[in-house]
Amino acid sequence: LIMTASLLTACGNNFDERLKDEAEQLTKKHCPQQVDDITTLDSVVYDMERRTYVRYFTLAADAVPVAKENRLAVKATLTDELKNDASWKRVKDEKINFEYVYRDASNGTLAFTIRLEPADYQARQ
């Protein structure tokens, strides 16, 4: 997703505050955002206390059962994308957690959550 240069180059504020502000701006400017045929990004927040960058999605109702069934494959895909996305380098260097929360479009209930921790996305040494 979009990561503006201001996060990576801003001075003065502490990193967590900048990341929180960046998430709020992303939500205001770009959400909701259609990610693909079945997924909409609703909002992004940064939980400073948990040091977790959270993305909230809505899944098309007919896609929820298949997505839930393939949750491990979804996690693997998200992990690979994060590992290979250089724009998140500074955030990953700070050992931030990433959380992906998926809700059912038909009723708003939680479908599932995927959490990636530094051990998931950092290269094995």
Stretches with model-predicted labels:
Residues F57-A61, Y102-S106, L116-P118:
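A mature extracytoplasmic/lumenal domain signature
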Residues L7-A10:
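C-terminal motif of bacterial Sec signal peptides marking the signal peptidase cleavage site
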Residues K20-T40, V44:
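Post-signal peptide N-terminal segment of mature Sec-exported envelope proteins
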Residues L82-L110:
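A short amphipathic beta-strand at an alpha->beta junction
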Residues L1-T4:
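Sec-dependent signal peptide recognition
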Residues G12-F15:
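Bacterial signal peptide processing site
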Residues P65-R90:
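Short, non-transmembrane amphipathic alpha-helical segments
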Residues V35-A61:
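Short edge beta-strands and adjacent turn/loop segments
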